[in-house]
Amino acid sequence: MRKINIFEELKRERIDKEFYINKCNALEKQLFEVVNELRKTQALLRQFLNENTPSSKLPFKYPSKEQSEKEPKPRGKPPGSNGGNKEAPESVDRKVKAKLEERCPRCGKVIRRRDIDTRLRYVYDAIMKAIIIEVEEEFYPCDCGEFCIGTHPDIPQRGMMGYGLQALFTELKFNFSGSYANISKFFDNVTNGKINFSPKAINDCIGRIAHKLEPSYDKIENELKNQDYAYSDETSWPVNGMQWYLWLFVTTNFVFITIQNSRARRVLIEIFGEDYHGGIISDCFKVYDNFAKWYQKCWAHLLRKAKFEAEKYPKKNIVKFYENLKHLHKEMANFLKENPSKELRTEKKIEFEKKLNKIINYKYWCKEAKSIIDNWLIVYRGHWLTAIEIEGISLDNNFCERKIRGSIGWRKMLGGHRTKEGAKQYAIIQTHRETWKHQGKYPYNELLNVLKN
């Protein structure tokens, strides 16, 4: 009887053991699935919230609804601060007199003319007036087969859209990212129906302008390889639902935009050639490596990465690492503001190099700081202090990023382009507009001159 109890006890223990083993295996499998799902979620979240996420996109930046209602922040200067008025214009187009009534509107007292003083103020106004021009056009069918048509400097030789209207269409399209339908409605509204062109007609007008500007666009592209340096950046750009990329380059004289179906090195090679004699100011995207004579890597990206990790791990010495980099960057930026001589630049570069190496060679950084050192500071060693030595360039790529930001509105509002031709037209026209602004000119007036000539 006793033997049977022992066997039964062993059997129960074996059953219990198998139950707990199966339960552990099931829990281990569930844990593995949860951890795997967590990693996928973290990877997906990191695509939207990382060191390159603009501050305007951070969800924790915005206050709650209750806090927003309690603490409104109106635009402009705070009440009681010094006013800021425009200076008097150099010329005026019209002069008017604002006259007083015979009596005070409040108490009815008679106002004597000899007691009245005057003052000047300036009012800025604008009108959009439709101008319909009747053109009496001479023509002559020559015996040689040529059909000769008379010309006028203020009138396009073909079409019904004048030069000013074409330039306005372009400004509304590119400056405000307006749809062709909205541009058509806008002109129909402000001109009381006198100017009413279909969206297709406006689209065709933009295409003709791009075609006219294409030779000078190609000329700017050919000039890039002869420039001493170029700021470079790229961003995603949908074309017919496919992922293309908008590349933007800023040099001393030009801004150049190209939209390609590639983010690879070949785009740079096609523009600058295999051995570019100048320098590239960019982020640490690897396609920029080993094709230019010198580089300046972007300190804004470096500091943003360090700050992101410091906020993520506030108890680690990544915080100290970020503070050291920020202090060094501020010191270098202040030095460049003084417009130093070449000799002083060479001397200070050695000093700043020692300070950067001291940060790099510190042995007790946490793994997050070491990761930045290994993958950023050491990999691109020699590319962080070029701006100290070479005059005219900055420590970061913010100059180019501010230019490329002008195209983001188009991408967000219009979703990129539906055709390759539309993408090419955008690159051509926007290259000229940004180049004119870069040169201190007004894009509307410059485009008007190009169309007339």
Regions found by a protein language model. Name each.
Residues 2-11, 21-22, 28-32, 139-141, ...:
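Catalytic center-proximal scaffold of phosphoryl-transfer enzymes
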Residues 1-157, 232:
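Short, flexible loop/hinge motifs at secondary-structure junctions
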